């Protein structure tokens, strides 16, 4: 009878830490490998500049004078109810949305600024 991945995971989850360490050592010897994490060379400045941020946090820095318009936009962006959206706007500065794509974040910033708010993307 062949063991499934689930059987193996269940067996390992029932082991003590010492038993898992012994299992890892035995696997290293059996297969001639090590369980050490691979080290990565430090990236130069060119590589760091090439990495572009993919997820953004939309932060409402200030609601401005037109709070009603800003509340409407916050509701559209987040799907929050009126009370929750008002709490976000009244609580500025605060996060409107996390994990937004670049396009989504830029569109949200534009909409909020058109409504009279001051917005930051992080």
Swiss-Prot record:
Keywords from the named record: Ribonucleoprotein, Ribosomal protein
HAMAP family hit by this protein: Ribosomal_bL12
A Pfam family hit: Ribosomal_L12
Family, similarity comment: Belongs to the bacterial ribosomal protein bL12 family.
Role noted for this protein: Forms part of the ribosomal stalk which helps the ribosome interact with GTP-bound translation factors. Is thus essential for accurate translation.
Molecular-function GO terms, alphabetical: mRNA binding; structural constituent of ribosome
GO cellular component, one term: cytosolic large ribosomal subunit
Native source organism of the sequence: Pseudomonas aeruginosa (strain ATCC 15692 / DSM 22644 / CIP 104116 / JCM 14847 / LMG 12228 / 1C / PRS 101 / PAO1)
Quaternary structure and interacting proteins, as annotated: Homodimer. Part of the ribosomal stalk of the 50S ribosomal subunit. Forms a multimeric L10(L12)X complex, where L10 forms an elongated spine to which 2 to 4 L12 dimers bind in a sequential fashion. Binds GTP-bound translation factors.
Name of the protein in its database record: Large ribosomal subunit protein bL12
Gene3D superfamilies for this protein: 3.30.1390.10, Single helix bin (1.20.5.710)
């Amino acid at each position: 009878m062949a063991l499934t991945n689930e059987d193996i995971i269940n067996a390992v989850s029932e082991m003590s830490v010492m038993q898992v360490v012994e299992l890892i050592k035995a696997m290293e010897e059996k297969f001639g490998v090590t369980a050490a994490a691979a080290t990565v060379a430090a990236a130069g400045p060119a590589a760091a500049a090439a990495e572009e941020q993919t997820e953004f946090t939309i932060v409402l820095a200030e609601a401005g004078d037109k709070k009603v318009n800003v509340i409407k936009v916050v509701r559209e962006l987040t799907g929050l109810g009126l009370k929750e959206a008002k709490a976000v706007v009244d609580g500025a500065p605060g996060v409107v949305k996390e994990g937004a794509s670049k396009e989504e974040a830029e569109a949200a910033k534009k909409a909020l600024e058109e409504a009279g708010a001051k917005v930051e993307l992080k």
